[in-house]
C-alpha cells in the first residue's frame, strides 16, 4: 500500500504546507541562495507495515510525521508532499515500491527502507536513477566495499552498534564465552559478525551461533541449544526480541544477555516484563538522553501518536533533519542530484535526538552510541521499565577501532565470517 499523508489525513495527492523550521548544519561550502521554489518537495518513505518488522516500520512513519508536524510541513523552505509506501518487508516488494516512488510519484528523496536485505535489493536501482536515499537499513557493505554514491546513512551499519557492545561485554562485563542468536538474514549476520570481531579482539570467544528464521513463532528450540557459556548475545528485530526473552526466561537461564540497537529498543519497553530486567544493549539513540532536541522529539511523539518512541522513529526524525539542513544549503534546490547529494554528505548536526553526528567519506554516520541497561529506576511516561545509559562511546565510526583499510581488507560480516574458533 502506498499513501500520501498530510496533517494526519490520507488522500490520493495532497500538499503539506506551513512555515519553515529545521536543523542547524555546518555547510559552509554550499552558500545558500534565496529560496524561491513553487514546486513541493516530494519526500518518499519505504517502510514495513505488516509482518514481524511492522512495529519498527510504523514507528519510522511516525518519526517522519513528527518532524513534519513540528516544522508545519516544511523542509528547506519548501512545502512537502509526503508519500509512504509499505514494502511488505520483502525484496521484491521493496523494489516495486521504490520504482513507484521514483517513476510515478517523482520523489526528490527516499527515506528507508527498513531491512538490510531490502536495501541490498534496491541499491543498483537507486544508483541508476541517481536517487538520493537516506536509509535506516543497516546493510554494511553499501557504505564499505560496495559504496553507493546516492546512499547516505544517518543511523548505523548493522555491525556499528554491536562492535562497542562486544567491547563492553568483554572488558566491563568480563564475559568470556558467549552464544549468539539472530535472524537468518543479512542484518543478523552483520550484527553478530561485528559483535564477534570486537568481542574476540578483547579476549572473548563465541561458543556457537544460532540462526532462527525471521518468522519464528517460538524460540524454545533455539534456547535449548544455548549450552555451555557465560553469556548470550541476541540481535532480534521488530517484535521478535519480546518472544525470545520470554522463552529465555521460561527456560530458567540466568546468563547475562546483551543485544544491539533493536533487541532493547525503547519502543519495546511497554511490552517487556520482568524477563527484560538486566538486558544490556547498545544503540545510536536512547530515550534517557537529557538534551533539548530529544525532549522535543519525545514530546512530539507523545502528542501526535500517544506512543513511546524508539530508535526507528528517532532515526527517521534525524533523517528529516539531515534533509532539511541540506535543502537549506542548496537554497531549496534538489533537481541537480549530485549537488544535492554533496550537500547531504556535508551535513554536520549537533542538535538531534541522538546527539551530534557527521558523515565519513563513504556516507556513513559517525556519532555517539549508548550502552543501556533495562531496569525500573528512573522510569517515565507511565512505563514500568526504563533504559538507563551506563556508558557512552563517542564518535563511533563503522570501522570501530580498526584502521579503515585493515577493516575493508576482510570480507563483509556474514553467516560464516568471522568463523567459529575453538574456545
Residue ranges of predicted features:
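N-terminal secretory signal peptides
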Residues: 1-10, 17-29, 35
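C-terminal segment of N-terminal export signals and the immediately downstream linker at the start
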Residues: 30-48
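Extracytoplasmic "Venus flytrap"
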Residues: 44-67, 85-91, 114-115, 181-189, ...
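Beta-alpha junction/loop-to-helix N-cap segments that form part of ligand/metal-binding clefts
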Residues: 55-62, 74-145, 211-220, 242
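Extracellular/periplasmic Venus flytrap/periplasmic-binding protein
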Residues: 96, 140-142, 149-251, 287-296
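Periplasmic-binding protein-like
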Residues: 101, 105-114, 134-136, 179-182, ...
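Extracellular/periplasmic ligand-binding modules, especially the Venus flytrap/periplasmic-binding
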Residues: 194, 238, 243, 289-347
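Solvent-exposed, acidic/polar segments of extracytosolic/periplasmic ligand-binding ectodomains
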Residues: 348, 352-423
Amino acid at each position: 500500500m502506498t499513501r500520501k499523508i498530510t496533517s494526519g489525513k490520507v488522500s490520493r495527492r495532497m500538499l503539506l504546507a506551513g512555515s519553515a523550521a529545521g536543523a542547524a548544519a555546518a555547510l559552509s561550502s554550499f552558500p545558500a541562495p534565496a529560496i524561491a521554489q513553487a514546486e513541493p518537495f516530494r519526500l518518499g518513505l519505504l517502510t514495513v507495515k505488516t509482518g514481524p518488522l511492522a512495529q519498527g516500520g510504523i514507528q519510522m512513519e511516525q518519526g517522519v510525521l513528527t518532524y513534519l508536524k513540528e516544522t508545519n510541513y516544511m523542509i528547506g523552505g519548501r512545502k512537502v508532499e509526503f508519500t509512504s509506501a509499505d514494502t511488505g518487508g520483502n525484496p521484491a516488494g521493496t523494489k516495486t515500491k521504490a520504482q513507484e516512488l521514483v517513476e510515478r510519484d517523482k520523489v526528490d528523496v527516499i527515506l528507508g527502507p527498513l531491512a538490510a536485505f531490502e536495501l541490498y535489493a534496491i541499491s543498483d536501482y537507486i544508483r541508476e536513477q541517481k536517487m538520493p536515499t537516506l536509509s535506516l537499513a543497516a546493510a554494511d557493505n553499501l557504505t564499505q566495499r560496495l559504496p553507493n554514491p546516492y546512499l547516505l546513512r544517518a543511523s548505523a551499519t548493522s555491525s556499528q552498534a554491536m562492535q562497542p557492545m562486544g567491547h563492553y561485554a568483554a572488558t566491563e562485563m568480563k564475559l568470556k564465552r558467549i552464544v549468539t542468536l539472530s535472524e537468518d538474514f543479512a542484518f543478523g549476520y552483520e550484527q553478530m559478525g561485528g559483535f564477534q570481531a570486537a568481542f574476540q579482539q578483547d579476549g572473548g570467544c563465541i561458543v556457537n551461533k544460532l540462526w532462527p528464521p525471521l518468522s519464528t513463532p517460538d524460540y524454545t528450540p533455539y534456547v535449548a541449544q544455548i549450552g555451555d557459556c557465560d553469556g548470550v548475545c541476541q540481535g532480534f528485530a521488530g517484535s521478535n526480541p519480546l518472544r525470545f526473552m520470554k522463552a529465555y526466561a521460561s527456560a530458567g537461564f540466568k546468563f547475562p544477555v546483551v543485544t544491539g540497537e533493536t533487541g532493547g529498543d525503547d519502543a519495546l519497553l511497554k511490552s517487556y516484563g520482568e524477563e527484560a530486567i538486566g538486558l544490556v544493549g547498545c544503540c545510536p539513540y536512547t530515550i534517557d538522553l537529557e538534551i533539548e532536541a530529544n525532549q522535543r522529539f519525545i514530546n512530539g511523539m507523545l502528542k501526535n501518536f500517544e506512543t513511546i518512541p524508539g530508535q526507528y522513529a528517532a532515526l527517521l526524525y534525524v533523517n528529516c533533519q539531515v534533509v532539511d539542513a541540506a535543502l537549506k544549503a542548496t537554497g531549496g534546490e534538489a533537481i541537480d542530484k549530485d549537488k544535492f547529494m554533496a550537500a547531504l554528505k556535508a551535513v554536520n548536526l549537533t542538535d538531534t535526538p541522538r546527539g551530534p553526528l557527521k558523515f565519513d567519506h563513504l556516507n556513513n554516520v559517525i556519532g555517539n552510541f549508548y550502552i543501556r541497561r533495562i531496569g525500573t529506576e528512573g522510569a517515565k511516561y507511565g512505563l514500568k521499565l526504563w533504559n538507563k545509559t551506563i556508558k557512552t562511546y563517542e564518535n563511533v565510526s563503522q570501522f570501530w577501532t580498526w584502521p579503515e583499510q585493515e577493516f575493508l581488507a576482510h570480507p563483509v560480516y556474514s553467516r560464516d565470517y568471522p568463523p567459529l574458533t575453538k574456545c
